[in-house]
């Protein structure tokens, strides 16, 4: 799935690195927290309220709709999948057949009952909607490929028994399937509501109706969004009853917070020096909320472009980068070094694959000499013109590090559309980016980048070992969890340590500052900037 840095730092997302974000704000003259109202701000307006039409804008899907499952983060940092719209499910021994029961009595905010047929409708819509952004999340279902390619008119892998019971059959075993059903990419829509709304669904608030804790009451494009509590909501009543979101630049958010007009400040969009001096070491230090972001920053190399075709050259690049210097100087040390593909906290994270990568410029020079590049070479690092300052600063340090071993890294900027086109074409020489998990499973990262030849091209790594690509694809079919995680660890070692197609950098913390009206705030489990309004508890 194409991931973002665009509007919000979400899901698993790849974040090519654009400035964006969300901050809660309470403007002067707004109602007090006792009234259950908060004001929020976003840097860029959303493009659509329809989850099927975006891989960036999840603030509406997360709060207006529900998925069959959700993800809960435990105090020890682990996560678990819990039931949401689904009341229960079973899986066959061969890992192919999933039988589901929906919770009884759930209705959409207009009173329309939730039915099992709505699940089938939703997943068929994901596969048939032109330019759908979420096909990856249901492609494992039997018949999905045929429906996607126009070779079928319905999804044969879903059978509806009655209003509360349905069965999903997969084309082949995939142990990460339930985790995919716990994402905002797979929120459930009503066949009746969407059909009657037509093109107004996802664009007109009163026609964009879900089962979640909030309803959209207004969307003034480019300006604001308004939400109110859904009195028909089936779950626990939230503390926040009304939400007003304004489009506002990050600098204004910071100023507003310091004036006392903000409820929550997302430090992601501030310079680390400001965060350190004003918030971490200032009067707000007791109001910080930090979570480990389940995401990884990485430097990806294109194996189709000389001399990156040579594994010794790629290993030399791995050894040249002073990752700790970047982490300290750019991010204020607010994170940890990662030596593999999967970030800390990800299911399948292998401690055995950590600790091997240390900066060694002499060894890097030796490898370059063995590869025939004793005098170095020129290469390009491609950067999105809308990249955040932190990304630009990181790339600058990487270029300086490479220069120390004789590699002249030219940093070339592209507008966002051109950057994406170049990467998707498989012709981007190298780039630095961030991937944040959509769902907590190693498949979310490794399959996206290395699960097929097409995937390796669209990510511009052009990894050429077809046997390893086949292993990545086959790993998702392993039913035994321990065996599957062992294979993912072995694949991580092969890709990063042996073949050096991936240069691991670091994972970061995501830090927020609570305003005086906020009693508790639970960030998204993966550290997205998108927040669940119900995760905010007011005094």
Question: Residue ranges of each PLM-predicted region?
Answer:
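Alpha-helical secondary-structure segments
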Residues: 115-122, 163-169, 212-213, 240-242, ...
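Aromatic- and charge-enriched surface segment that lines or borders ligand/interaction sites
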Residues: 87-135, 167, 256, 307-309
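N-terminal lobe/hinge region of extracytoplasmic solute-binding protein
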Residues: 41-93, 209-210
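Ligand-site clamp/hinge motif
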Residues: 230-276, 408
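Structural transition elements
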Residues: 336-370, 385-393
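Detector for C-terminal structural segments
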Residues: 220, 318-348, 390-397, 422-539
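Short, low-complexity disordered leader/linker segments with a strong preference
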Residues: 1-38, 49, 358, 537-539
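Gly/Pro-rich hinge or "lid" segments in bacterial periplasmic/extracellular proteins
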Residues: 73-76, 153, 163, 170-238, ...
């Amino acid at each position: 799935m194409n991931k973002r840095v665009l509007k919000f730092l979400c899901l698993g997302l790849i974040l090519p690195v654009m400035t964006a974000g969300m901050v809660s704000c309470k403007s002067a003259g707004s109602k007090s927290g006792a009234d259950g109202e908060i004001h929020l701000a976003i840097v860029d307006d959303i493009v659509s309220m329809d989850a099927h039409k975006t891989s960036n804008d999840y603030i509406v899907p997360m709060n207006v709709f529900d998925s069959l499952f959700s993800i809960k983060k435990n105090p020890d940092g682990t996560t678990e999948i819990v039931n949401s719209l689904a009341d229960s499910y079973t899986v066959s021994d061969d890992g192919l057949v999933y039988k589901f029961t929906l919770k009884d009595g759930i209705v959409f905010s207009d009173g329309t009952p939730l039915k099992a047929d709505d699940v089938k409708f939703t997943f068929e819509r994901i596969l048939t909607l032109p330019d759908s952004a979420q096909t990856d999340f249901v492609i494992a279902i039997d018949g999905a490929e045929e429906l996607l390619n126009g070779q079928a008119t319905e999804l044969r892998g879903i059978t509806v028994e009655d209003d509360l019971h349905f069965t999903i059959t997969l084309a082949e075993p995939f142990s990460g399937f339930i985790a995919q059903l716990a994402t905002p990419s797979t929120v459930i829509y009503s066949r009746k509501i969407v059909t009657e709304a037509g093109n107004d669904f996802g664009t007109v608030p009163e026609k964009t109706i879900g089962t979640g804790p909030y309803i959209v009451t207004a969307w003034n494009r480019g300006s604001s969004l308004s939400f109110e509590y859904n009195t028909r909501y089936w779950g626990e009543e939230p503390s926040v009853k009304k939400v007003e979101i304004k489009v506002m630049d990050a600098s204004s958010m910071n100023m507003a917070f310091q004036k006392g007009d903000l409820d929550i400040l997302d430090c992601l969009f501030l310079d680390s020096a400001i965060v350190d001096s004003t918030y971490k070491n200032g009067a707000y230090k007791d109001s910080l909320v930090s979570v480990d972001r389940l995401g990884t920053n990485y430097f990806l190399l294109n194996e189709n472009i000389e001399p990156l075709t040579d594994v010794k050259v790629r290993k030399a690049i791995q050894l040249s980068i002073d990752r700790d210097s970047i982490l300290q100087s750019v991010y204020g040390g607010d994170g940890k070094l990662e030596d593999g593909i999967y970030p800390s906290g990800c299911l399948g994270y292998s401690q055995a694959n950590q600790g091997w990568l240390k900066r060694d410029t002499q060894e890097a020079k030796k490898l370059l000499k063995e590869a025939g590049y004793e005098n170095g070479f020129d290469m390009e690092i491609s950067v999105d013109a809308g990249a955040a300052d932190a990304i630009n600063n990181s790339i600058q340090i990487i270029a300086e590090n490479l220069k120390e071993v004789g590699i002249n890294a030219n940093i070339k900027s592209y507008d966002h559309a051109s950057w994406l086109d170049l990467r998707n074409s498989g012709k981007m020489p190298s780039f630095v980016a961030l991937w944040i998990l959509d769902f907590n499973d190693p498949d979310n990262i490794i399959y996206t980048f290395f699960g097929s030849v097409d995937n390796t091209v669209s990510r511009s790594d052009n990894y050429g070992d077809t046997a390893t690509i086949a292993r990545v694809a086959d790993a998702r079919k392993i039913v035994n969890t321990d065996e599957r995680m062992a294979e993912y660890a072995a694949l991580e070692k092969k890709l990063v340590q042996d073949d050096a197609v991936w240069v691991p950098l670091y994972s970061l913390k995501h830090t927020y500052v609570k305003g005086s009206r906020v009693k508790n705030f639970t960030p998204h489990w993966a550290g997205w900037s998108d927040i669940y309004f119900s995760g905010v508890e007011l005094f």
